[in-house]
Amino acid sequence: MITKVDRNAVRKKRHARIRKKIFGTAERPRLSVFRSNKHIYAQIIDDTKSSTIVSASTLDKEFGLDSTNNIEAAKKVGELVAKRALEKGIKKVVFDRGGYLYHGRVKALADAAREAGLEF
């Protein structure tokens, strides 16, 4: 019997390989992205303390768009997370794409965060 490939399991394996190489510090924390079918989430994490410094998602009250699962929503989340990071004094981050391909919503979030002032 032919088994179907579980795309999320493959993504999790890919993310584990990426996480072996990427580590966020207090000087340069990790910008982690999680994407679901309906929403997109971004966190800036200090891995030395295992704590989230800043987060933003399409579930936030400040979000303000009707649709939450498209490229425009991802751009808005990228701008929000960058604005909140700059308020906390964070300018440089390490981008963690979460095992997702750098395309579509993930790329839109990253580009919007760069345009808003984050460096990676």
UniProtKB/Swiss-Prot annotation:
Pfam families: Ribosomal_L18p
Record keywords: Ribonucleoprotein, Ribosomal protein, RNA-binding, rRNA-binding
A GO CC term attached to the entry: cytosolic large ribosomal subunit
Organism domain of life: Bacteria
GO BP terms in the entry: translation
A molecular-function term among this protein's GO annotations: 5S rRNA binding
Complex formation: Part of the 50S ribosomal subunit; part of the 5S rRNA/L5/L18/L25 subcomplex. Contacts the 5S and 23S rRNAs.
Family affiliation: Belongs to the universal ribosomal protein uL18 family.
Function in brief: This is one of the proteins that bind and probably mediate the attachment of the 5S RNA into the large ribosomal subunit, where it forms part of the central protuberance.
Name of protein: Large ribosomal subunit protein uL18
Source organism (scientific name): Geobacillus kaustophilus (strain HTA426)
